[in-house]
Amino acid sequence: MIQAGDFRKGTTFEMDGDVWQIIDFQHVKPGKGAAFVRTKIRSVMTGSNRDMTFNPNEKYEEARIETREMQYLYNDGTLYYFMDPDSYEQLPIDKASVEEAILYIKENDMATIKFFKGKAFQVSPPNFVELEITQTEPGIKGNTATGATKPATVETGATVNVPLFVNEGDKIKIDTRTGEYLSRV
C-alpha cells in the first residue's frame, strides 16, 4: 500500500479498477483547511490523463510494474515490433505506447519497456543516443558572437537544435530526456 502523501513522479498505483501513473504532483498545505496532494495522472491501460486531488492519508495498492530491455526491430505502419534478446520472442506494441520514444530509437537499438500484468504500456529510449544528421541548413561563419543554434533533422525524424558548426552527415549525441544536443561524435 502507498499513501497519497508519498506520491512521486512515475509512481504507479491501482485505483477504480485501473492502473495510474503520476505525471506531475504538488503537495499543497493551505493556510486554512487540510493539506492535499494535487496530481496529474495517466491511465497506464488507456493513456487518458486526469487531474486529481488526494487526501495525503488515503492509501492505494501499489502497481507491480515489470521492466525489460528489448531490441527494436521494425514498424509496419500501425505496430512497432520489439524482440526479447534472451528468448527471441517478438512483441508488437501499438503507436500510443511508443509515443515520442520512437524519435530516438533506430532499428536494432535497445529500449526499456514497462509491463503491467503482461501488457506493454510504455517504451523508453536509452538516456543518450548517437544519431546522424540527415538535413540541416549550412552554418555561415561570422553569423553570431555567441553560441547560436539551428534546427537539424536526424535519421529517425526527430528535430534537434544544434550549433552552427554541425553539418549534414555528422553524428551527434542527444539527451533523450530533454531532446537536447550534447556533442558531436
Curated annotation (Swiss-Prot):
Disulfide bonds: none
Pathway where it operates: Protein biosynthesis; polypeptide chain elongation
Gene Ontology terms describing biological process: peptide biosynthetic process
Major location category of this protein: cytoplasm
Keywords: Cytoplasm, Elongation factor, Protein biosynthesis
Location relative to the cell: Cytoplasm
Any single Gene Ontology cellular-component annotation: cytoplasm
Molecular function as annotated in GO: translation elongation factor activity
Short name of any one Pfam family annotated for the protein: EFP_N
Family membership: Belongs to the elongation factor P family.
Reported function: Involved in peptide bond synthesis. Stimulates efficient translation and peptide-bond synthesis on native or reconstituted 70S ribosomes in vitro. Probably functions indirectly by altering the affinity of the ribosome for aminoacyl-tRNA, thus increasing their reactivity as acceptors for peptidyl transferase.
PANTHER family named among the record's database cross-references: ELONGATION FACTOR P, ELONGATION FACTOR P (EF-P) FAMILY PROTEIN
Name of the protein this chain belongs to: Elongation factor P
Annotated organism of origin: Finegoldia magna (strain ATCC 29328 / DSM 20472 / WAL 2508)
